[in-house]
Amino acid sequence: MSKTSIPKNYHDLLGLYDTQRAIGIIKTIFQEKLCAALHLKRVTAPLFVLNDSGLNDDLNGVERPVSFDVPCLDERAEVVHSLAKWKRYALAEYGFRPGQGLVTDMNAIRRDEELDNLHSIYVDQWDWEKVITAKDRTLPFLQETVRDIVDAVCSTADELRWKFPELKAIRLTREPTFITTQELEDLYPDLTPKERENAFTRAHGTVCIMQIGGQLKSGIRHDGRAPDYDDWTLNCDILFWHKALGCALELSSMGIRVDPAAMTRQLEAAGCPERAELPFHKMLLEGKLPLTMGGGIGQSRLCMLLLGKAHIGEVQVSLWDAETKAVCERAGVQLL
């Protein structure tokens, strides 16, 4: 059954032609602003990695990667879910220094994604990573970086409204409100994690929810996180209130990455200490990889947010079930 729902009073602010123009402008302007704010250089990234490299992102630990055999190598490869671990490896290989980082155009297939207004099996995002020092592994440093990203988003929105006056009603809150997952649970103890996100983002406009992955006092986790890239005490999601949909839109998942102590602790907590024997994990535990922070910023989601679109299929080409197509057609929503 389709989870797609188009609001009754929704209407597209831009036609197909201007939507394509705007998407190109957003991707150019935002990447420039992001690179300037975080001191990033664009690099070329892989679409797939070897199965046994340990470089793929396990996400919540249950999603199955798209896998295929490579006869000339006598190996199997898998399409990346994200580049969270590859980026850290690349920073070491390319000789980036503290304060410097990289950004890639990441394209992925997430075959097990449940389709709705915000989710597609095709994922496109800016995957970024930068080298930091031990003294940078703090919540204030994380928050400073979040503010830089939010400022880049809002400045892109400002330029877009100048080019497309039809978007004048789309306004974003430039100052993010920070809250931990435990504080959020304490504030809304009777709501589910997703309901808490919606309630808090509705109230504040732009929010940063920190410390995702570990168990809360209630015994549950706010959301899943793989144990081998983010430090669960130093990570976050950035959410904006999406006026057209009337819900929180998660634009970015990011964080300060695990050091050897945090990785060991989190692998044990997740019940998978054997991962420490994988090549990437061994390099990290042996101190051969730099300390880093990084994240992913959804390209299609940013376009949805800044263009006021009600469905992600209005800004990207993907595959949709018959019911989703029918719901969109009845509402006059044109899927690309």
Report each predicted region and the residues it spans.
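A generic secondary-structure signal for well-formed alpha-helical elements
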Residues: 34-42, 149-160, 310
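Extracellular structured ligand-interaction cores
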Residues: 100-102, 123-127, 204-206, 246-248
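A general structural signal for short secondary-structure junctions and capping/turn motifs
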Residues: 68-70, 92-98, 118-120, 169, ...
